[in-house]
UniProtKB/Swiss-Prot annotation:
Gene3D superfamilies: 3.30.420.40, 3.40.367.20. GO terms for molecular function: ATP binding; D-glucose binding; glucokinase activity. InterPro entries: ATPase_NBD, Bacterial_glucokinase, Glucokinase. Keywords: ATP-binding, Kinase, Nucleotide-binding, Transferase. This is Glucokinase-like protein XF_1460. ATP binds at residues 18-23. It holds the Pfam family Glucokinase. NCBIfam families: PRK12408.1. Signal peptide: none annotated. Disulfide bonds: none annotated.
Amino acid sequence: MIPNPTRDAPNIPSFVAADVGGTHVRVSVVAAAPTCASPPQLLDVRTYRCADYPSLSTILNDFLGTRSAVRDCVIASAGFQRSDGTVITTNLPWPLSPHRLRADLDLAEVSLVNDFEALAYATEDMEAAQLLHLTGPAKAQDGPRLLLGPGTGLGAALWIPNNGRPIVLPTEAGQAALPSTTELEMQLVRHMLNNRTHVPIEHALSGPGILNVYRALCALQSVLPQHASPDAISHAAAAGTDMLSSQTLEVFCDFLGSIVGDLVMMYGAQGGVYLAGGILPQLREPLLRSHFVERFLNKGPMGEALQHVPVRLIEHGQLGIVGAARWYLNKKAT
């Protein structure tokens, strides 16, 4: 829960907040704002490539340097946190354990929070981050807000209003089964089931998912893949040099529209949808050309209700750090 926004923030020393993704880690020293309503102050933001470091401890040790006064750290990361504090995730290049980090870095406290749970705590900071309004009214109704974004995996969380003290519900929506609507999508899912018993949503809606969809399309058309990375597929689609690359992004956006619509109905997210993550800002043009909105609204009689739900694309940027910091400050205040 979030404390009264007009109340003075607790007197908390500076701490470190990190947003840990499958590709990058963003880290900052954070100073608490004077009131709970004010955004935390990010004093020194740095970005690290995961592939360049053998562990998160190495990254944080490099960042901390001579900052011996910093004793606490909060980490936003994808995955499911077990009761012993370790994180179950398929998207990080190394294990993540707060006990190990605390020992390695000689810190007093290391806290973990789901990455999209942290992002949900930054909802009040998102207006300035809006890149694109995709559908729905400019002003949303009061109600739960859905945050969702494909990156190395697919993150999702729900922000629920609660008389000025909102509740954030983290989810593992990316691990739910990938639904199919069209005949082509059914063929793609059937092909993906050839070597697995479960096709999760993030097997299509993620950076690696773009490559999975592309390879499946190539297999269905008996064509050898010409590209070996999501970036190469996106560049070929943007250049108009490869029909299958363009079709891959079309399928990706269609899946996204359907799944966002499904989640809005499941969670009653009448307060709107924020699309984040590291991929979608790079796919603005394919998203605008796609059937995203049509698929989002294609829910039978419920399509009319979905017309009143705004869907916005935001630039994730430093919001993961801000959200992690807000989560930590809220934890200290309650």
